Amino acid sequence: MSSVAVLTQESFAEHRSGLVPQQIKVATLNSEEENDPPTYKDAFPPLPEKAACLESAQEPAGAWSNKIRPIKASVITQVFHVPLEERKYKDMNQFGEGEQAKICLEIMQRTGAHLELSLAKDQGLSIMVSGKLDAVMKARKDIVARLQTQASATVPIPKEHHRFVIGKNGEKLQDLELKTATKIQIPRPDDPSNQIKITGTKEGIEKARHEVLLISAEQDKRAVERLEVEKAFHPFIAGPYNRLVGEIMQETGTRINIPPPSVNRTEIVFTGEKEQLAQAVARIKKIYEEKKKKTTTIAVEVKKSQHKYVIGPKGNSLQEILERTGVSVEIPPSDSISETVILRGEPEKLGQALTEVYAKANSFTVSSVSAPSWLHRFIIGKKGQNLAKITQQMPKVHIEFTEGEDKITLEGPTEDVNVAQEQIEGMVKDLINRMDYVEINIDHKFHRHLIGKSGANINRIKDQYKVSVRIPPDSEKSNLIRIEGDPQGVQQAKRELLELASRMENERTKDLIIEQRFHRTIIGQKGERIREIRDKFPEVIINFPDPAQKSDIVQLRGPKNEVEKCTKYMQKMVADLVENSYSISVPIFKQFHKNIIGKGGANIKKIREESNTKIDLPAENSNSETIIITGKRANCEAARSRILSIQKDLANIAEVEVSIPAKLHNSLIGTKGRLIRSIMEECGGVHIHFPVEGSGSDTVVIRGPSSDVEKAKKQLLHLAEEKQTKSFTVDIRAKPEYHKFLIGKGGGKIRKVRDSTGARIIFPAAEDKDQDLITIIGKEDAVREAQKELEALIQNLENVVEDYMLVDPKHHRHFVIRRGQVLREIAEEYGGVMVSFPRSGTQSDKVTLKGAKDCVEAAKKRIQEIIEDLEAQVTVECAIPQKFHRSVMGPKGSRIQQITRDYNVQIKFPDREENPVHSVEPSIQENGDEAGEGREAKETDPGSPRRCDIIIISGRKEKCEAAKEALEALVPVTIEVEVPFDLHRYIIGQKGSGIRKMMDEFEVNIHVPAPELQSDTIAITGLAANLDRAKAGLLDRVKELQAEQEDRALRSFKLSVTVDPKYHPKIIGRKGAVITQIRLEHEVNIQFPDKDDGNQPQDQITITGYEKNTEAARDAILKIVGELEQMVSEDVPLDHRVHARIIGARGKAIRKIMDEFKVDIRFPQSGAPDPNCVTVTGLPENVEEAIDHILNLEEEYLADVVDSEALQVYMKPPAHEESRAPSKGFVVRDAPWTSNSSEKAPDMSSSEEFPSFGAQVAPKTLPWGPKR
């Protein structure tokens, strides 16, 4: 590509304006030269000659290709073809195509490759896969496995070659499977089989088989050989630093494995090509034989501790000796006690090697420095700083500190060790001179207090005295604390720690019980009050419990005397709080509350301050009249008197005191104040105030309007008199087990006593503590009579007798079954009488009864009644279809249980029939006769009930009949109700909520027919008693829905209004404000035409709602249109430079003008033909006023603009510019087209004059771009 730039005079001047003044000056001096246009050759230099091109073309492309690495395409595409006979999904009509597509989609999602399928003419399947290389390979494997029919084949190769097919970590096998799109199964190592199974397409199997056989053939060329070589000669074969064996391996391409010195094996293993392996073995054998002949050994003793110096780091010293002298040094294993070192080599070199061994052994030394163990960490320094100074200078010296030992061990080169030892000894001497330590015993329970919160105490001591304090961890339970550092600091720290400890020993902890309700008050707002207490007792720590714990215990800890003082102070505070928490309620008529508060709360504030109480008034919107006063008792009473006096002064409020005995107060108040409240409400809302319970006062105060007070007084005195005459009370005692007998069945006995005497008899409730106490209340004579009767009954009950009766043994079981339930009921009902039946198995009919005489007689009578019931028992069958049984039983059998209790019968339901279909059974012979007669009758009577429908009722005949009627009454009945089909879905309700509600309310089942039936009836099933209610409820619902339908029809009245589309935005208003107002005001929906819908008339506005509302909305719209039609629009020229100022920030200024003059002002958009044209719309008089206003603003703002522009001229003077002449463009001299020579213009079609780049120069084809 080439680009052409045309340099005009304007652009040249613009370029020059950016030059620095110096450049401009030079440009001006040389203007004459610059005026001359450049020559064509200067402006367009010619291309290199042909020869140069040829030379450069002849160069190899290596320069380019060597520098740039090949760029591989990141996305590749491969096409696979699956022949018809190998396709897995051939028949497209049997969901094959769908399954095939589904599989392809799965493969794309899993691999990230893109698949495209197409069918060839031969019905073969072509699959194009695009994506990254690994994704394409995985997708290909999946396609073959899932879309192509699979075949399998086995390849036998030697077992030892299997591991080469698998490769390292199975990588080779995975690669092979991806390449060939097959599944290759290799037998496990413990399986003797040598068969490798390949599964895939025919083509894939062939490829995989070929690859496996290739790997095996490769391994056949390789061989493994083991050579026994004495362990002592291994170093000679390996050579110094394994160089010799490395050279042999490189030259022969054979892998040689020499066992390491630590492994006691002698064989050397060779692996590689047979010929090269033979060469390597021969060379090793030669070295071995040669060394065996020439070498000899000497043994020397070297200290065990010096062996490691002879070996050197990673055995480097041994390799160094071997390299220099050719002698191998054998060191005994570290676990051996031997100190003998053997040197093996040629005799003349052994001397030199021995010298080196001793030099290595003695090159390092071990030394120790005596230093107290407590100084070790000071020698090491913070983060090892002190020690680092020594080790940096002498890196080969190893310094070791042993915990608990008073020495430091140094190890390394002798010279370095000596220097390091001197330095450490100097450090130790210096530390001993200027440091000291002391150990003190403090009970470990105080250690955490010495440390303080987050180590605050101990860190302060450390920093203050420049010492180190070592406190043992809690787990050690040790009392010993060690202080180390400057001698003076150590003594000071010791003194402070002991003082702290002694202070803690004198400390005590005390638990103070304070009700949790006072905790917040004691703490105060933002902890102000508790801060005062802590400032008063700074040495005492006060801990309040967590509010969530609901605990009353406040813990004080500190010096004994201070804790005692703090305890007394807090107890006094709590006593004051308790005293001040007395509370009384004052009922004040609601209309006087504002007078009690006073202007700006002046009255109530004055009462609070003078009485020192807290006064809470009910909220204004509350119905409560009660004012609550809290504080000291005397203060509360004073505040109450003042509030009542205000009320008395304000209105005609009378106050009367009535004397009523204190013992009658509770009975007059009634349960939860119901009785007294009813009198207060009945008498015009008077206030009746009873004295505090336990005060002993008889005075009751009635307060209110005088007429109402008198009425309340009369009622109260009448009620008190009535209570007094009837309030004679006597308490008698009787054992709780007698109570039921005294009450009698269904309360019959006690009712008889009440009716005969007129007294009220109260038995204790289950929760009462005194269960023996029976209270008789009423007039004195009635109470005495009732007492006499009850005491006679109790006396009879206390006379215990023993009696017996005869009961047929066949009835015994009825009394004792269900763990003696019947006997327990008799005992409870008849004063705890004991009934004993003979043991089962004995044929005795004697039953013993023991208890009070009356109880025994009553129990005998009851047992006799039960026996008579049992003897008179009959069984009645009640036929009810089995489908209704569950409904008859009721939830958890509640209905049946009720019937059995009411009629004293037993009811048994049949077992559910598994197969309700009647089957004809063959006749069965019984005692030689055919039982065909009965069966024949049964079969011929289709009306007879099924066995599974019959419910059996047992009991007295009349009770069984009554129970049968009750059961039949429980059989559900179905009725049909006419309900229009279109209302069914509304009756059902959302998710069936409507119908479910009706079913629950009326206890029936409502069945709505399926929608496809379009039936107008709804079936109601349930008890006859509930059906009428349910039907009425359903019909009421139908009426409601029909009324809603009618209302919906009325609401859907539509009205269209024709309005010019230009007025639509005005009717809608800013952010829809105007139209929303109309919608809400008239409760209608207003629809504007869709601008994008060409078929819809654009001037029609649709209003939907009630007819009357739509007409009102239409009138409102037409009124707006009428106003808009009266409006005029005028264009006014307004300088664009002042537009922004008139509009203002975020349009505030222009909005203010539009609101003030009730006009609409539109400014031109950027790029408008006339940027000064502003349109003002509104009523004519408003438009005129608005235009005058904005023109005035323009005049004012333009003056500012002109001043600003004039100032800018002086602030930024124009750059030096030459007078601009008409642009000549870019001019050159001696151009080919301007020459007068007779040369004709070049022929563009000629390859000689316009040669193509590199076309003639191709003696040798060289690829363009990087080498492959």
Curated annotation (Swiss-Prot):
The UniProt record lists the keyword Transport: yes
Modification Phosphoserine occurs at: S11, S31, S317, S645, S1247, S1252
Residue spans of biased composition, Polar residues class: 1233-1249
GO CC annotation terms, alphabetical: cytoplasm; high-density lipoprotein particle; nucleus
Feature: compositional bias, Basic and acidic residues: 932-947
N6-acetyllysine, modified sites: K991
N-acetylserine: residues bearing it: S2
Annotated compartments: Cytoplasm; Nucleus
Phosphotyrosine: modified positions: Y437
GO molecular function, one term: RNA binding
Keywords in alphabetical order: Acetylation, Cholesterol metabolism, Cytoplasm, HDL, Lipid metabolism, Lipid transport, Nucleus, Phosphoprotein, Repeat, RNA-binding, Steroid metabolism, Sterol metabolism, Transport
Phosphothreonine: modified positions: T8, T295, T296
Disordered, as annotated region: 910-947, 1213-1268
Cross-referenced PANTHER family: SCP160 (PTHR10627), VIGILIN (PTHR10627:SF34)
Function: Appears to play a role in cell sterol metabolism. It may function to protect cells from over-accumulation of cholesterol.
Name this protein carries in UniProt: Vigilin
Species: Mus musculus (Mouse)
